Amino acid sequence: MREAPHVLGIVLAGGEGKRLYPLTADRAKPAVPFGGAYRLIDFVLSNLVNARYLRICVLTQYKSHSLDRHISQNWRLSGLAGEYITPVPAQQRLGPRWYTGSADAIYQSLNLIYDEDPDYIVVFGADHVYRMDPEQMVRFHIDSGAGVTVAGIRVPRADASAFGCIDADDAGTIRDFVEKPLEPPGTPDDPTSTFVSMGNYVFTTKVLIDAIRADADDDHSDHDMGGDIIPRLVADGMAVVYDFSNNEVPGATDRDRAYWRDVGTLDAFYDAHMDLVSVHPVFNLYNKRWPIRGESENLAPAKFVNGGSAQESVVGAGSIISAASVRNSVLSSNVVVEDGAIVEGSVIMPGARVGRDAVVRHAILDKNVVVGPGEMVGVDLDKDRERFAISAGGVVAVGKGVWI
């Protein structure tokens, strides 16, 4: 039995998430609440921790306070055993500047790699919804002998132009890596599907260090992992693709096997929530064998009084539904829905309040939003357009702390 390799986890969590505005007006994209009890970063951290990768650096930058606080309060590991999940903002070790890209974030944090001296480094994104056992991908990488392994998910070729696409040969060696091509390549075994990059990579340590240092010296580079580092290694013949559909997560069902969602737009974020409240959701939050860990607040249970009800909904701890109707919605913790109010097809984040006889439909309410008595959101889009953001799909998004 071979010795387990020494693996360091690096999570790229500096994303601004402009397409999710106003949800990212006051927080980094990985800190956006999701699913009634989580933040987006909880999915990647859960995957790494479940795989027993317990030395993790989270590289942060944009409006990172809520993200830093969430990690420090909810992701404490045993320091006695050398385990840690630590947020790392730009240290400005190489001069008075912030990160200029995801590759530059690693370049400015090379001291963390030198200190840990790992055999391999997993570099994962922080803002996707999925389950994955990264240990299987690391084993695949070691067996392949490649310098970098790129996780790829199969999508219909007709839908692949919105993503970074992978062209691989029959052996899995990546021949080309192209961002948003007009003509996406097929996979070796299926010309109707395309491997799309998940933004998850496994590197042999020396290969990553050499590529990062060379990129830092390139004045023409954008210093981006997907846009610069991976194409550089592809050109050198050092990159292979890992087929995400081969990843077997304990407790997974046929429906949620290889589930992965980029929730970087309001519509994608909303649709992923609506899946959660369906009778048979594609993504199962209740897989106890591969749990997603989230907020650990000590809150009272949700309460329904005076005939209040919730149907096909997720309702977070500490919430109170009083003589109100909630349908097809996700309510986070400490949400109050008052007498006579109606909430339908909506995503309500922690601490929000929907007043007496108010109506909220097809909407996303950020933290601590207050909808006053008799007010309506998502009913008159022309009126809402004057006050709030509205997605291409007609979802009304109300920013943090707004009183209506």
Swiss-Prot record:
Q: Nucleotidyltransferase as a keyword?
A: yes
Keywords, sorted A to Z: ATP-binding, Carbohydrate metabolism, Glycogen biosynthesis, Glycogen metabolism, Nucleotide-binding, Nucleotidyltransferase, Transferase
- What CDD domains does this protein map onto? ADP_Glucose_PP, LbH_G1P_AT_C
Which Pfam family, any one of them, does this sequence belong to?
Answer: Hexapep_GlmU
Q: What are the TM regions of this chain, as residue ranges?
A: none
Q: What is this protein called?
A: Glucose-1-phosphate adenylyltransferase
* NCBIfam families found in the cross-reference section: glgC, PRK00725.1, PRK00844.1
